[in-house]
Amino acid sequence: NDILKLIEDYPLKLDIEYNINMKAMHDIKKPLVELNEMIGMRKLKDSIIDQVIFFSQDLHKDNDFMHTVIYGPPGTGKTEIAKIMGKIFSSIGVLKNNKFRKVTRADLIAGYLGQTAIKTRDVISDCLGGVLFIDEAYALGNREKRDSFAKECIDTLCEGLSDHKDKLMVIIAGYEDDLNKCFFSYNQGLNSRFPWRFHTDDYKAAELNLIFQKKV
């Protein structure tokens, strides 16, 4: 709300020199309205705004990662949030396009060793310039770590996170404990490549009622 009020109070004028990147603020007005209109999740929204300000006001460096984790159970709006984040980052020019692709284990892992790396790289290449969203990313691996296909996929993904850090935003979602044990534990380099971690809030009864009314 504060950012939207700032945009309303200060129309963009080319003959005025602002202390902040006001053009970036105006460019993200539409997706910010979408984010604001989502029911509940106040803490999550505030965290996303911190990330947006960091990148939109050029506070980041070339070696900073955009990759993000959204913790939470199914049905808490993680996919919609990821789409809005893609719109925001493409609007400010950090991402080159508004491409958004949601994938699961079946989209990344093949039936034979060696093919999984190729399949994963193809998905990464297809998403360059936009957002790759891996829902339930913990399903890529398992707690026992006996799946060699999972290791091949996750290692290839980890490589792509660095090689294309300025061209790609990877967002993964799922339960925190499962992601830690079935995804991050496969490769020690993964944790540092996902500096942004958000948690979805549990909906309150009144919020669930509003969601129901909105759908009706």
Pin down the residues of each PLM region:
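Pre-Walker A (pre-P-loop) alpha-helix and adjacent loop at the N terminus of AAA/AAA+ ATPase modules
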Residues: 25-71, 87
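A short helix-turn-beta junction within AAA+ P-loop NTPase domains corresponding to the substrate/partner-engaging
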Residues: 183-202
